[in-house]
From Swiss-Prot:
This protein's encoding gene: KSL1
InterPro entries (alphabetical): Isoprenoid_synthase_dom_sf, Terpene_synth_N, Terpene_synth_N_sf, Terpene_synthase-like, Terpene_synthase_metal-bd, Terpenoid_cyclase/PrenylTrfase
Documented EC number(s): 4.2.3.-
Keywords: Chloroplast, Lyase, Magnesium, Metal-binding, Plastid, Transit peptide
Motif (DDXXD motif): 522-526
Residue range covered by the transit peptide: 1-36
Record protein name field: Ent-kaurene synthase-like 1
UniProt lineage: Eukaryota, Viridiplantae, Streptophyta, Embryophyta, Tracheophyta
Positions contributing to Mg(2+) 2 binding: D522, D526
Family: Belongs to the terpene synthase family.
Tissue expression: Barely detected in leaves and germinating seeds.
Cell location: Plastid, Chloroplast
Residues that coordinate or bind Mg(2+) 3: N666, E674
Cofactor dependency: Mg(2+)
Organism of derivation: Isodon eriocalyx (Plectranthus eriocalyx)
């Protein structure tokens, strides 16, 4: 099946005499004490996470925004006193020991400078702080001032515009700052250079003072909740310059919730819950939270239909909502992202926002216009340029961008879960105009549950390999054949990525066995067996007699038929308790289909004329092995599947789309080798019709993308399917598997990448990340 793509006779992972594994070799799961794992408290963690999904969103205080709110004067008292004195109290009580305010990190001194100067302004303006507190803050600014122009420091959005203006505000208030004048000149020159380039000046309007038309800003950008951009700082700045009842109501509503401080963005409920859903899915623990996730998505879709500000006024939120809703079959259309197809207007956008747009651009359906393709083109180029220019300072974000671009065609689910656990930072800091933490989304509970669940799977995967080895070496004697590829370890790896739930181990074992057998049979038909032996094996399976009653012409035919017979009988027995019927006849039929496909391919090698592309794809769909492997596998997913469902039109479309993706991607990688061996291949067929190699490959890739869109549409639809989502997902994962296997440029790259992924999945324990330098 998929092994056709591997084609790696020299690959150490495919050694014909691969040694059996010993229990626990290289398995260090027991060392996970570094992340405080206890396999007994998963239920408690699930309960706590469910409460987070349903409860109030947790977000850290923003010293920067609280300071701007503290600067708002009370107009009822002729602006001679603060309108929000409780914010001043918070500032006084929350200075850091080094004199700064805000979240601290060595890589975020610009953020600390911004927060500290912002806090000094209202303290000095209203004359409420002790001289020592002010001196400590001023001293921090003096000692850290050089960081303001350091390109290696992570910069908050709009820092180059806002920070110089706050220096000017300090000067207007007679607050002396011991800053080098050359540095101040550089800051203001940088500010002047940034002003014409920044396409989102209104968002950083607190750094523009009287130079901006505040009435126009309010008219164009004030949201229904009274805020400007859901930003307390910008809203407070508007209220300082223009008395606006809605702005005041917004700030009052904030302080009724947070009492003495404000966050840097509010409201953030929709975005926070979408992030939480995205993490639960990406970390592989979503199966514990199906009702909660569905509730979040239903509410999000309701707001989507209303074009709610909280979604549509936030680019990252809109992109994430589109992706998550579409992947669950909600009717959302790409025109909602049409405003973002012009990449030039996003020069000043954060890399994390562009990454969200990039991920949204990949969820394409057949009926879509070119919006998502255009979005994909510029976001891919933007992110690639960010990597090449080394401008992403946050190492966690850098790894996320690298991971997404490297796997832009597809990634296996379990590998994705494992790598997402590595990327999950419980102390993760996000940054807008200031840095903040998001405990609802990044917390120890989610990490521990993900790590514990992964360790449970990892231990189960180890047991399954030993079970597969007994089947392969003892029950089937497949290693007694002196030809062909032993892909047992790879099929074990592939099966682990088809279903992650440790309880569905029979499904993984079935998938691994079926792929191993199809690979052995394919090698026999392709390189070793004669036409007569190929006919004989098909007839033996059609007649289905006990191996001991048959006189075989060769040991190879005996081993192969006996392996098919024994394995099929065993799978049918194991499927019976769930299915309530014997599936043996279905499996026999599928074996005949795939072997007939092999036979047709053998005959085509000696044919005088090539088939046309449609005829070839029909043959290739059968011979790639998706039908027997996936249609056998889905009987072990814990849901009842009738024979009518398996033989029905929907299933036919599902497996044929998945098979076409795999076959055509295989062809792109192997056509040069197969051309030398005088075999048929879709690329060769198109080149024979007059296309160049480049044109032929491009045409095949377009077919693949179209098939992928068709497959995704069948998988995500919410109505009209006879299969539950877990079954339809098996075909989506099969398509992703094709992209994973054929995402490499040569036969030597593949084993190295796969070997690394196998090590992560089967041996390496997850490690906790807790570093305040991880900022997005």
């Amino acid at each position: 099946m998929f092994s056709l793509s591997l084609n790696l006779k020299t690959n150490p992972l495919l050694d014909n005499k691969t040694h059996r594994s010993s229990s626990g070799i290289g398995f260090r799961g027991s060392t996970i004490s570094t992340v405080k794992c206890s396999l007994n408290n998963s239920k408690d963690l699930i309960v706590k996470i469910r409460e987070r999904v349903k409860g109030n969103v947790e977000i850290s205080p923003s010293a920067y925004d609280t300071a701007w709110v503290a600067m708002v004067p009370d107009r009822e008292y002729s602006s001679q006193r603060p309108r929000f004195p409780e914010c001043l109290d918070w500032i006084v009580k929350n200075q850091n020991s080094d004199g700064s305010w805000g979240v601290q990190s060595p890589s975020m001194l610009k953020h600390s400078l911004s927060c500290t100067l912002a806090c000094l302004l209202p303290l000095h303006k209203w004359n409420v702080a002790s001289p020592q507190l002010l001196r400590n803050g001023v001293e921090f600014i003096r000692s850290s001032a050089l960081a303001a122009t350091d390109k290696n420091q992570i910069s908050p959005i709009g820092f180059d515009i806002i920070f110089p203006m706050m220096i000017q505000y300090a000067n207007d208030l007679n607050l002396e700052l011991p800053l080098n004048q050359d540095l101040v000149h550089i800051l203001f020159r940088n500010r002047e250079a940034q002003l014409p380039r920044n396409k989102n000046l209104e968002y950083v309007a607190e750094g523009l003072g009287n130079s901006i038309n505040w009435n126009k800003v309010l008219l164009m950008h004030q949201r229904s909740n009274g805020s400007l951009f859901n930003s307390p700082a910008t809203t407070a700045a508007a209220l300082i310059h223009r008395h606006d009842k809605k702005c005041l109501e917004y700030l009052n509503s904030l302080l009724s919730v947070y009492k003495t401080w404000v966050p840097t963005i509010h409201p953030v409920d929709v975005y926070a819950r979408l992030c939480l859903v995205d993490h639960l899915q990406g970390l592989g623990v979503y199966r514990f939270f199906h009702p909660e996730i569905e509730d979040v998505l239903q509410e999000t879709f309701r707001l989507w239909q209303q074009k709610d500000d909280e979604i549509f006024a936030d680019t990252a939120c809109r992109a994430m909502a589109f992706r998550l809703l579409r992947m669950q079959g909600y009717p959302v259309t790409p025109d909602a992202l049409g405003a973002y197809v012009d990449g030039e207007s996003f020069e000043s956008s954060g890399t994390d926002t562009v990454l969200e747009l990039y991920k949204a651009s990949q969820v394409r359906l057949p009926e879509d216009d070119d919006t998502l393709e255009k979005l994909h083109d510029w976001t891919f180029k933007f992110l690639k340029q960010q990597l090449e220019s080394k401008t992403i300072l946050d190492q966690q974000l850098l790894r996320k961008v690298e991971f997404n671009l490297k796997n832009h065609r597809g990634i296996l689910d379990a590998v994705k879960h494992r790598r997402n656990i590595d990327l999950y930072d419980i102390d993760h800091i996000r940054i807008l105009k200031t840095a903040y933490r998001f405990p609802t989304v990044y917390n120890e509970d989610i990490f521990l549950l993900s790590a514990q669940d992964f360790m449970t799977n990892q231990a189960q995967f180890q047991k399954e390999l030993q079970m597969l080895e007994r089947w392969y070496y003892d029950d089937c004697r497949l290693d007694d054949m002196d030809f062909g590829r032993n892909v047992l370890r790879i099929t074990h790896f592939i099966s682990a990525n088809m279903v992650y739930d440790p309880q569905l181990f029979e499904a993984r074992l079935a998938f691994a066995k079926l792929i191993s057998l199809t690979t052995r049979l394919d090698d026999f038909f392709d390189h070793h067996g004669s036409i007569q032996e190929a006919h004989l094996i098909i007839e033996l399976i059609r007649e289905w007699n006990e191996p001991s009653t048959i006189t075989f012409p060769s040991q190879d035919v005996e081993i192969l038929y006996s392996a098919v017979y024994t394995t099929t009988t065993d799978l049918a027995e194991k499927a019976y308790p769930v299915q309530g019927r014997c599936i043996k006849s279905v499996l026999i039929y599928l074996w005949i289909c795939i072997l007939t496909g092999y036979k047709i391919e053998m005959a085509s090698c000696t044919a005088e004329t090539l088939p046309d592309i449609d005829e070839y794809i029909e043959i290739g769909q059968a011979s790639i092995g998706v039908n027997i492997c996936v249609l056998g596998f889905i009987h072990f997913l814990g849901v009842k599947i009738s024979e009518e469902m398996v033989m029905g039109e929907e299933c036919d479309k599902l497996w044929k789309n998945a098979a076409s993706i795999t076959r055509l991607l295989n062809d792109i990688q192997t056509f040069k080798k197969e051309q030398e061996e005088r075999k048929i291949n879709s690329v060769i067929i198109l080149m024979n019709s007059g296309l160049s190699e480049e044109e032929a490959v491009s045409n095949i890739l377009k077919m693949v993308i179209d098939k992928r869109k068709e497959l995704l549409k069948l998988v995500v639809r919410r109505e009209g399917s006879v299969f539950p989502r877990i079954v339809r997902d098996a075909f989506r994962k099969t398509g992703n598997l094709g992209f994973y296997l054929y995402n490499f440029t040569d036969e030597f790259t593949l084993p190295l990448q796969m070997k690394e992924d196998m090590k992560l999945l089967f041996h390496d324990p997850p490690h906790v990340h807790s570093a305040t330098s991880h900022v997005t």
